[in-house]
Regions:
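Non-catalytic structural scaffold of enzyme domains
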Residues: 1-260
Length: 260
């Protein structure tokens, strides 16, 4: 049986990319809801409806687990999906706790989509772990749009990030938490703007580690040739141009993977 990765668009490829490195004997399904991206500026009810449609499709594919490789979908819908479907469902959370644990003295900046930044789940997370009030939140909605059109290194991207990150005195911060899977594509540009003392933290490693833990507990880890099937909003991706597009995103992730 295969492992499904679900995202509003191509951001979730960053989580799949890490899983492909550490689970070379597994077979995967990647579902990008390209018809409805971006989720971060939609209403909560709209996102819940999109997620349920995707889950109905993926469960029909007889997958053994679903990784919600989307912070927005996790914050809005993952609890409800766990009640609805009887398979392991692993969500993404902004790794604010991890960032605080790494330092504990300097400030932490969490970048995410507006719906994640302003959501109840984020507030609960901050209330639980940010006892010293060291966390600041930064919505970056345009990064999702830039990523979806493969615009990673343009003057517009640099100007946008320079403006938004420039709202903060970054020398006071130890970490930038990438609270949206689309944001990993921009690590090189962000690195140019950030001071040396500031590093990246994302939830990809922890999410895949939790996936492995749950599958191991169920004795469902495989020893098969690695494959990936790609779907856009329920339609299998077979067009060579679209497969080449996905390959370009994965190549981009190879390039930024080791940027800290």
């Amino acid at each position: 049986m295969k492992i499904a990765f679900f995202d509003s668009g191509i951001g979730g490829l960053s989580v799949l990319h890490h899983a492909m490195r550490v689970l070379p004997k597994e077979q995967f399904v990647f579902y990008a809801d390209e018809d409805n991206v971006p989720y971060g500026v939609k209403t909560t009810d709209e996102v819940k409806g999109f997620v349920q449609q995707a889950f109905d499709f993926l469960v029909g594919c007889d997958v053994k687990a679903i990784v919600v490789a989307c912070n927005t979908a996790t914050s809005v819908a993952v609890r409800e999906m766990r009640h609805r479907y009887d398979i392991p469902i692993i969500g993404m959370e902004p790794a604010a706790k991890k960032a605080l644990d790494l330092d504990g003295e300097h400030r932490v900046l969490v970048a995410a989509t507006p719906i994640t930044v302003h959501g109840k789940k984020m507030q609960i997370l901050i209330d639980r772990f940010d006892k010293d009030h060291l966390v600041d939140l930064l919505p970056l909605p345009r990064l999702v749009e830039f990523a979806e059109r493969e615009e990673f290194r343009s003057e517009a991207v640099h100007a946008y990030l320079d403006q938004e990150l420039g709202r903060f005195h970054l020398a006071d911060y130890s970490a930038l938490v990438l609270g949206c899977t689309h944001f990993n594509y921009f690590k090189d540009t962000m690195r140019e703007i950030m001071p040396e003392n500031m590093h990246f933290v994302d939830g990809n490693e922890g999410t895949v580690r939790e996936l492995i833990r749950q599958l191991d507990a169920r004795h469902e880890l495989e020893d098969l040739p690695q494959t990936v099937d790609y779907y856009y909003s329920g339609r299998r991706v077979e067009d060579p141009a679209e497969l080449a597009r996905i390959a370009r995103y994965l190549k981009r992730l190879d390039f930024v993977y080791d940027i800290r």
